[in-house]
Regions:
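ABC ATPase NBD coupling module
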Residues: 67-82
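ABC-type ATPase nucleotide-binding domains, specifically the catalytic core motifs of the NBD
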Residues: 94-113
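Conserved ABC ATPase "signature" region
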Residues: 65, 108-121
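The feature captures the beta-strand-to-loop junction immediately N-terminal to the Walker
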Residues: 35-37
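Short beta-strand immediately N-terminal to the Walker A/P-loop
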Residues: 32-33, 83
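Conserved ABC transporter NBD signature motif
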Residues: 58-69
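Helix-to-loop junction immediately C-terminal to a conserved catalytic motif
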Residues: 50
């Protein structure tokens, strides 16, 4: 099981502060629920924990290993982290891969679909 530690995490998107000095710890074998209004940074926080976005300020540790500096060992650890959104929309006429690619087609994304599929495998 994993332990997750967030220390002094701050994150901006387009110069807008999304997360400001967030601190918390999840002990091994724990379950957490992140609640908040739309735009409060829930998805941003989850993307940072999953390594889908780069940490700008602060630290995210999984089993005492820094997420941003542990590219080689964390993929197996990150596979043990899951998150479920309250609302989701899948297009039934698309494959799983096409559903994953859909939002990337409309954004200037730095991510490649193959990288995302590797993370979710």
């Amino acid at each position: 099981m994993l332990a997750v530690s967030i220390k002094n995490l701050s994150h901006k998107i387009n110069n807008k502060s999304i997360l400001n000095n967030v601190n918390f710890e999840l002990k091994k074998d724990s379950i957490a629920c992140i609640l908040g209004p739309s735009g409060s940074g829930k998805t941003t926080l989850l993307k940072l924990i999953a390594g889908l976005d780069k940490v700008q300020n602060g630290h995210i540790l999984i089993n005492d290993q820094e997420v941003s500096s542990a590219k080689k060992h964390l993929p197996t650890e990150k596979r043990k982290i899951g998150f479920l959104f309250q609302d989701y929309a899948l297009f039934p006429h698309l494959t799983v891969k096409e559903n994953l690619k859909y939002p990337i087609n409309f954004k200037n994304s730095i991510y490649k679909i193959e990288d995302i599929i590797d993370v979710v495998k």
